[in-house]
Amino acid sequence: MAVPQSKTSRSRRDMRRAHDFLVTVNRSVCANCGAAKLPHHVCPECGFYKGREIVKKAVEA
């Protein structure tokens, strides 16, 4: 079986893990309703994308 030849130093271990951090999710504001949404995605609240209604939402009575 493979066995490490020498102990990995803290510096080398941390440099290897430098790119493993979590990336924060970028949010944008919907121009139609003002809700938070992902960029380049249809708004989950109102169904609009680039000023056009893509998904028809049922009107609550």
Curated annotation (Swiss-Prot):
Q: What are the record keywords, sorted?
A: Ribonucleoprotein, Ribosomal protein
Q: Which gene encodes it?
A: rpmF
SUPFAM superfamilies per the UniProt record, alphabetical: Zn-binding ribosomal proteins (SSF57829)
The identity of this protein, by name, is Large ribosomal subunit protein bL32
Q: Which family does it belong to?
A: Belongs to the bacterial ribosomal protein bL32 family.
Organism's domain of life?
Bacteria
Asked if the record carries the keyword Ribonucleoprotein, the reply is: yes
Name one molecular function that GO assigns to this entry: structural constituent of ribosome
- Which GO CC annotations does the UniProt entry carry? large ribosomal subunit
A Pfam family of the record is Ribosomal_L32p
Listed InterPro entries: Ribosomal_bL32, Ribosomal_bL32_bact, Ribosomal_zn-bd
Q: Does the keyword NAD apply?
A: no
* Swiss-Prot/TrEMBL GO biological process terms: translation
